């Protein structure tokens, strides 16, 4: 028997209320802050991610699903959402729009990762990107938007971690100092971190291995190497967050995993016991648009994993309202009533009344059992005798009462009762 591929999951009907709830609140918060939805293809030119995410990153070197199609084009299933949005921004001339251009997405993401709780090889992200504004107040607004999104969902006990990793002018000095420090401790590092020493030095700070974390504890801090412009930007961001009453913790080891980040980086974590560690994060990518062939354009974004959000909702006992389902079951008795009930079901649905119905000949007792198992409150019973009289039986399943209702009044009566 076939099963879903490793690292993927089926989203069954009982989980759909969570997904509907998260998507609904995502669209709501996006509208509040003026973001418009943009959907990009599931696959892109592989070069887009090599160029934007960075050849030395784990995503590009280990985690991308890349294939060659029959035309010889090298394509990659989308491993993150920002680069495709930036590609669409350039391709469709959005740089002529009023700045900042605010876009959001709800997308499937694909990474060949080790499956674990809240982490899948195909997962889903909600992300928003603001392109064309350099001021740190935008950074603060995006962080507030992310924070408010979680609050809307009921996840309120949160921790915000913040750092600035500088720009292309000052970051090389910091990376040089970091490399010098780590080279003195190379013997204490895991094999992956020894590789990162030359290829992706900033990621040394992010290693979760105990021996590497011990070395990272005394590593140089990016804040000590910021140029005057980056320092002023970071100071203004902290000032704006304070005005917004958003508590933050400066984490000088926070770097994020993508090469395109600059200046602001942040992560949000729920503090509830047993919660998934990081549920969302983001930062600035002021050089990415230029890197993809556009003009130098500042930008800032955020993304959050929907599976991780739902895991935290369940752990905190937050249960969304169930999705609407039919409150009426339509039963019939007899061949003539069978055809009439089929037409009646169509009329009821056109009037906005959700209906369950039976399709094959069953006894009325079996149909009522089916209605009871579906949890409906009302059953409409149509038989040969009722058809002759131009009426139907409307039965209350909770109170076991029933009444004959003329067919031309049935829709109004059902709407009145439900």
UniProtKB/Swiss-Prot annotation:
Question: What are the EC numbers?
Answer: 6.1.1.21
What is one GO cellular-component annotation here?
Answer: cytoplasm
- Asked if the record carries the keyword Coiled coil, the reply is no
This enzyme catalyses:
tRNA(His) + L-histidine + ATP = L-histidyl-tRNA(His) + AMP + diphosphate + H(+)
Where are the disulfide bridges? none
Q: Which GO terms describe its molecular function?
A: ATP binding; histidine-tRNA ligase activity
**NCBIfam families per UniProt:** hisS (TIGR00442)
The entry's localization annotation reads:
Cytoplasm
EC supergroup of this enzyme: ligase
Set out the biological process GO terms recorded for this chain's protein. Answer: histidyl-tRNA aminoacylation
PANTHER family under this entry? HISTIDINE--TRNA LIGASE, MITOCHONDRIAL-RELATED (PTHR43707:SF1), HISTIDYL-TRNA SYNTHETASE (PTHR43707)
* Keyword presence, Disulfide bond: no
Which keywords belong to this entry?
Aminoacyl-tRNA synthetase, ATP-binding, Cytoplasm, Ligase, Nucleotide-binding, Protein biosynthesis
The molecule here is called Histidine--tRNA ligase
Question: What does the sequence similarity comment in the record state about its family?
Answer: Belongs to the class-II aminoacyl-tRNA synthetase family.
- Name of one Pfam family that matches: HGTP_anticodon
Question: What is annotated about its quaternary structure and interactions?
Answer: Homodimer.
């Amino acid at each position: 028997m076939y099963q879903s591929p490793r690292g993927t999951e089926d989203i069954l009907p009982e989980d759909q209320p969570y997904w509907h709830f998260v998507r609904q609140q995502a669209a709501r918060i996006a509208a509040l802050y003026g973001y418009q939805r943009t959907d990009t293809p599931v696959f892109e030119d592989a070069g887009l991610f090599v160029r934007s995410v960075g050849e030395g990153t784990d995503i590009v070197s280990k985690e991308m699903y890349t294939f060659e199609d029959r035309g010889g084009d090298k394509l990659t299933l989308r491993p993150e959402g920002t680069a495709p949005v930036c590609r669409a921004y350039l391709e469709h001339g959005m740089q002529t729009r009023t700045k900042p251009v605010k876009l959001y997405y709800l997308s499937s993401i694909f990474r060949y990762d080790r499956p674990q709780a809240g982490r899948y090889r195909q997962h889903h992200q909600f992300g928003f990107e603001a392109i064309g504004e350099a001021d740190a107040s935008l950074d603060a607004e995006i962080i507030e938007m992310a924070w408010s999104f979680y609050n809307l969902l009921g996840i309120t006990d949160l921790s915000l971690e913040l750092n600035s990793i500088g720009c292309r002018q000052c970051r090389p000095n910091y990376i040089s100092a970091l490399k010098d420090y780590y080279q003195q401790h190379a013997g204490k590092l895991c094999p992956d971190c020894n590789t990162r020493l030359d290829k992706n030095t900033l990621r040394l700070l992010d290693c979760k291995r105990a021996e590497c974390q011990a070395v990272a504890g005394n590593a140089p801090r990016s804040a000590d190497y910021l140029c005057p412009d980056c320092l002023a930007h970071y100071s203004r961001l902290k000032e704006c967050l304070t005005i917004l009453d958003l508590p933050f913790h400066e984490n000088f080891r926070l770097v994020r995993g993508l090469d395109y980040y600059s200046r602001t980086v942040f992560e949000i974590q729920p503090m509830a016991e047993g919660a998934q560690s990081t549920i969302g994060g983001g930062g600035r990518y002021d050089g990415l648009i230029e890197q993809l062939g556009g003009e130098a354009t500042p930008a800032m974004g955020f993304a959050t994993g929907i599976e991780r959000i739902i895991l935290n909702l369940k752990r905190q006992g937050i249960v969304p309202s169930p999705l609407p389902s039919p409150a009426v079951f339509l039963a019939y008795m007899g061949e003539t009533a069978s055809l009439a009930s089929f037409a009646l079901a169509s009329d009821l649905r056109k009037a906005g009344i959700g209906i369950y119905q039976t399709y094959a000949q069953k006894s009325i007792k079996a149909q009522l059992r089916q209605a009871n198992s579906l949890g409906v409150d009302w059953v409409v019973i149509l038989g040969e005798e009722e058809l002759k009289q131009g009426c139907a039986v409307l039965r209350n399943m909770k109170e076991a009462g029933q009444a004959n209702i003329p067919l031309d009044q049935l829709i109004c009566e059902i709407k009145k009762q439900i």
